Amino acid sequence: MSPNTRTGMHRRERRTNGREQPRKPNQDERKREGGSFSHQEQSRLPEQKKEWSMQPHHVFELYQRGRHLFTKNLLPGKAPFAEQLVREKGEEYRHLDPRRSKLAALILKGCTNTGIRKGNIVLYLGVSHGYTASFISDMIGNEGLLFGIDPAPRVMRDFVFLAEARKNMAPLLADANHPEEYVGRVCLADVVYQDIAQRNQAEIFIKNCQLFLRKGGYGLLAVKARSIDVTKRPKVLFEDVLRQLEKVFTVIDFRILEPEQRDHCMIVVKK
């Protein structure tokens, strides 16, 4: 026997005191055997996915599952934007993605009152293809009505197809910068929602609210800083818009929408 072998044997004997030590089971073996983990081991375990149930959100007509927002689907089985549908207790819900909707980003940032209620009349300026508008359609229900305005024929065509299925939406091909064009076609609204990428977006919002927003109604303005001035810091532009709105309305909420919506904020006012 070589000296190295003898030295190794002596070391093993000193470590075990002459007895064979049992092997410590790994985490998987302990889990199979029903054993408990130490505090240190538990801290290294992957977090288990929790099963959340759908709960009413503190914002009217919205629901929450974990940190995700949902509306009750007005047309069960239909997902016009390939959104996730969740069925629970005989109801179907649509997932409202904050990366696609500034309304969702606003609520997840802590806004507690959007002013949107079941049965409301909503004037949506800059409706585009109708993603957020379709969720507002869920929120206001069949008793409500949403006027969707956009000047682009291509996106308005998509919105027309959406409105054919959702009877509480009315498409209008018009420029929100010229509200006089649709004065005779739009009634007073409970809510004015604007999402327009124009330099004078604050002025457009004020003009439309003065014409169409009823006394005590709510206005929601999505401010796109880079559409106003690319040379100024977004926060400076947000403050400028806030000052303009405060001269006319009561500002009840203001949220910067980072990181879901870059260089955007949302302002909620009451007339």
Which residues make up each language-model segment?
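N-terminal auxiliary segments of SAM/dcSAM-dependent transferases
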Residues: 2-94
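Conserved alpha-helix/loop element of class I SAM-dependent methyltransferases that forms part
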Residues: 57, 76, 80-81, 97-121
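Residue-level signature of catalytic and energy-coupling elements of molecular machines
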Residues: 107, 126, 192, 269
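Conserved class I S-adenosyl-L-methionine
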Residues: 117-128, 143-147
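S-adenosyl-L-methionine
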Residues: 147-201
